[in-house]
Amino acid sequence: EHSIVFAPAGTHRDVRNRTVLGGRGAQAEQVARMVSDGGKIRNSSTLVAETEAVRGFLECDGLMLKPQGRIESVPALDAQVDQAQLSHEASVGMIDDAKLDYLRAFGLGEDNARDLIVQGFLNLEDQRIPESVRATVENLVTAARGAEKM
């Protein structure tokens, strides 16, 4: 399961996911990508292993575009049996000024450079993300950046 959460200024997103691996040999991968453009995001993702020989992976990554925003990401693993393999990765950080400077050196404006970094972070080209979702996310990011200029 892949989720993308975008929070423009003045918004608060509270996302909770719980995946139960209840059948022998079950597998799950949850990937959450969060972008705060001044809004607040709280993400809580849990993998529960209830039976033997299950595997699960959580990935929760957040990108802050403005220091006024906030991202809180809480990954949780609940192995209720001995033979479960569960793991997670999580990161939250500000947009990298060095990356912005690098892209601006090639003639991109700051807004275009930010949009490019966000799109790369979200990995919208991932074939597991439906085309309709990709288009919606791109439109939301563009609209939020446009509203900011008004």
Segments from the language model and where they lie:
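Conserved beta-strand/loop scaffold segments within soluble protein domains that form the structured core
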Residues: E1-L108, L122-L124, R128-M150
